[in-house]
Regions:
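ATP-dependent carboxylate-amine ligase
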Residues: 1-22, 32-38, 44-51, 61, ...
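Short secondary-structure boundary segments
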Residues: 67-69, 182, 204, 239, ...
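Short, basic phosphate-binding NTP loop
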Residues: 2-111, 121-133, 268, 272, ...
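Acidic, Mg2+-coordinating active-site environments of NTP-dependent enzymes
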Residues: 72-76, 188, 197-351, 428-432, ...
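Short, polar loop motifs at secondary-structure junctions
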Residues: 65-73, 140-143, 240-242, 265-266, ...
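Short gly/ser/thr-rich secondary-structure transition/capping motifs
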Residues: 16-26, 93-95, 158-161, 180-186, ...
Length: 492
């Protein structure tokens, strides 16, 4: 059930080749190649990068690494220095790290994996570390860069060459640490091979991506790879999660040199939340830790965010920061974009935009809002499910909405290439009495804002920070936040 896979052995590149490559940027997308760059032509899941070698050369590639699987021959008309590398798909990250001079070894790289919570934790770690004097970069769902200045990205964990290029650039820009979301796809597809993780956090394991992994057992095994990583010093595990508790126990047996820190509400946790209170203004929590006990009051909402704070405390303290200073900076943290993001207008409903797109995340978001809901008020939930993804998750999302909300509006999410009504039809058996079924997500949001009472709470779930809606392969501009803000402004 648990994987002990470690990164592949270092790819040996002739020193002269490294000398020629030094100072150049590597890309695995020919469209990103500029004069003097290096093109890495891998075989991908859907496309073969070697077919783009001519385009990369036209764009100015000065060198090409290509996947040598025995069935490909270099065209002598491509008059560019090159080298074939066997199994390049899995070695690309290690290759790129070596070409860049392994500068990422000079960074404290913190990896965060789990079904939910990755974005919040990486954002908070970077912000908190910055406030503690550690210039910290971010790689993740919301974007790549530095806290408050992120460039949009298409993947939670980028392609392996892109990961190493980002780390190289961050180091050149003065970063001394990097907080990185590590997706199960990223681990399974070798996107993080070559990354020198120093500390890793496991948040939870709940149903998601079964269209890719097939079973929860396979999904969990992929996640566990990060904690058997060569050179890892700290494993920080949520033991309120069943799989996390099992993983923590296994790591303590398998890895005697690894510092394993458990966190959560559990009485067995090393970083234990011993007191928690919530209000519409935020929360207050008391943490017992190996470094002492302390209190933190923040504007964050939810028990799950208390767990996320505990993870941040564990990682930062394990990396040498004093507990009192860690708690001081965490008190200043704000929600990550699209994560329990509140829109408040006096005399109007409280609207909360959240990325919750799994049954567990939706259940937790709704239970958090039920805790702070005024007496006699209603909690609304506006949600849908993504197309071309795990269909079995759809009725579970519906059940979570019915269980946690007083009024449910079923709508579209990112239908992608599916008919949105078909997706809704998969949800509806679990939602026998919806307040409204509306394919048009903008109309659904406006309906909830218009119909809710002034003291009601509306959760708009599923898309969070996203500023697009994917319909038939085309991404149209769409922001839950913008639509809700406008609807609130127009409400009388």
């Amino acid at each position: 059930m648990f994987s002990k896979l470690t990164p592949l052995a270092e790819t040996n590149i002739p020193p002269l080749l490294c000398a020629n490559a030094a100072g150049r940027l590597l890309h695995s997308d020919s469209r990103q190649i500029k004069q003097g760059d290096i093109f890495v032509a891998c075989q991908g899941e859907y496309t073969d990068g070697r077919s783009y070698i001519p385009a990369a050369i036209v764009n100015g590639a000065a060198f090409v690494f290509w996947d040598d699987d025995g069935n490909f021959a270099w065209n002598p008309e491509w008059k560019v220095p090159n080298q074939g590398i066997k199994d390049l798909k899995h070695r690309a990250g290690i290759l790129a790290a070596q070409v860049y001079g392994n500068v990422s070894d000079d960074l404290k790289v913190w990896g965060v994996t789990g079904t939910n919570g990755k974005t919040s934790i990486t954002q908070w770690l970077a912000h908190a570390a910055d406030l503690l004097g550690e210039k910290t970069a971010i790689i993740g769902t919301v974007g790549n860069g530095f806290w408050g200045v992120l460039e949009e990205t298409t993947h939670t964990t980028p392609a392996p060459v892109d990961v190493q290029t980002l780390l190289y650039r961050f180091r050149q820009q003065g970063a001394t640490a990097a907080a990185m979301e590590v997706s199960s796809h990223g681990l399974d597809q070798s996107r993080v091979n070559g990354v020198p993780f120093r500390s890793a956090i496991f948040t939870n394991l709940t149903r998601d991506h079964l269209d890719y992994h097939g079973t929860m057992e396979a999904y969990g095994a992929i996640k566990s790879r990060l904690f058997y990583w060569h050179g890892l010093k700290h494993a920080i595990i949520n033991v309120d999660d069943e799989y996390g508790a099992e993983l923590a126990g296994r790591l303590k047996k398998d890895c005697p040199d690894l510092a394993v820190y458990s966190y959560g509400f559990s009485e067995h946790a090393d970083i234990r939340i011993v007191h928690f209170t919530a209000s519409s203004d935020g929360m207050e929590a008391v943490f017992q830790t190996p470094w002492g006990e302390g209190r933190c009051r923040t504007r964050l909402l939810g028990r799950f965010n208390a767990q996320n704070l505990a993870a941040c405390i564990a990682l930062l303290c394990a990396n040498g920061y004093p507990l009192d200073k860690v708690l001081d900076v965490l008190a200043k943290i704000r929600p990550a974009s699209g994560r329990m993001d509140c829109i408040m207008n006096s005399g109007k409903p409280l609207v909360v935009v959240d990325y919750a797109h799994t049954p567990d995340a939706l259940e937790k978001a709704l239970s958090t809002l039920q805790e702070i809901k005024p007496q006699g008020a209603a909690l609304w939930c506006v949600f849908g499910c993504g197309g071309n993804r795990d269909r079995g998750k759809r009725p579970l999302m519906g059940a979570a909405a019915v269980q946690g909300a007083d009024k449910v509006v079923v709508t579209s999410d990112n239908p992608r290439l599916e008919n949105p009504q078909d997706i809704i039809n998969d949800i509806l058996p679990a939602v026998p009495h919806p307040e409204r079924v509306e394919v048009d997500r903008a109309v659904a949001i406006r309906y909830a804002v218009e119909q809710a009472a002034a003291n009601d709470i509306i959760l708009i779930a599923g898309k969070g920070h996203e500023n697009y809606q994917d319909v038939q392969g085309v991404k149209h501009h769409f922001s839950d936040f913008e639509i809700a803000e406008k609807a609130l402004a127009e409400r009388r």
